[in-house]
Amino acid sequence: MDGGKELILSERLLAIAQWIRPGSRVADIGTDHGYLPIWLLQHGRATFIAACDMREGPLEHARRSAEQYGLQEKLSFRLGSGLSCVVPEEIDTIVIAGMGGETILSILEAAPWTNNARYTLLLQPMTKAEVLRPWLSEHGYSFLRERLVLENRTYFPIMALRGGSACRPLSLGQAWGGVALQDDPLQGRALDELLRLRTYALNGLERSVVPKNRERAEQQRAILVQLRQMKGEWLHANGKRN
């Protein structure tokens, strides 16, 4: 390291890093500035890291960051789309963070070998978690745990999963509100925000004169019912009153 300088991660990236077991072999997809791989090496969490990005610019930023901390020789920099630049046998942990849920979905869809119990997946969608969660569960990725991080006044979910499991559908509430967040201290406020946004969406649909929006309004009502139920269960489990 450059004079023993330690990299400080954002709370969102730190939450992901803390879930990576010491000795892991990691692929960081969409590595951007390479901050997560640098932190993992500094703290002895990984024995191998492939820092991957589909654009040369971010990958060059990652190289420069690694040089600043004297770690450029310990990282494998890969230029390629998604997991296309990763050899399945060289890793056991896959991190895909800071992308939209639909983008994460498409990356995994293009790499069916990830649906195997040998791999731990750490996913952090910036948007469309309600699209990503059902797809994962319906394709045999089981949720090991979830947590929320509040960053820039937005609640971001972090998910740990493993492939090779039985496929099962999720409820609307689980798709939107999470699968394993019952004990998360931020879940109550995150559900409040979801309820506010879904109510706003429903109000807009109810004012619409487009026939198709009636069906969409019914779905929003169903989502709201299940989210309210989840909020009640969270309050009960955490000994709180509404």
Feature roles, as predicted:
Residues 2-11, 15, 84-85, 90, ...:
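Class I S-adenosyl-L-methionine
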Residues 23-32:
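Conserved class I S-adenosyl-L-methionine
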Residues 34, 38:
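Glycine-rich SAM-binding Motif I of class I
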Residues 41-42:
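Gly/Ala-rich phosphate-binding loop of Rossmann-like dinucleotide-binding domains
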Residues 48-53:
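Conserved SAM-binding motif I beta-strand of class I
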Residues 55-57:
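Conserved SAM/SAH-binding beta-strand->alpha-helix loop
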Residues 60-88:
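S-adenosyl-L-methionine
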Residues 91-98:
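Short SAM/SAH-binding signature in class I
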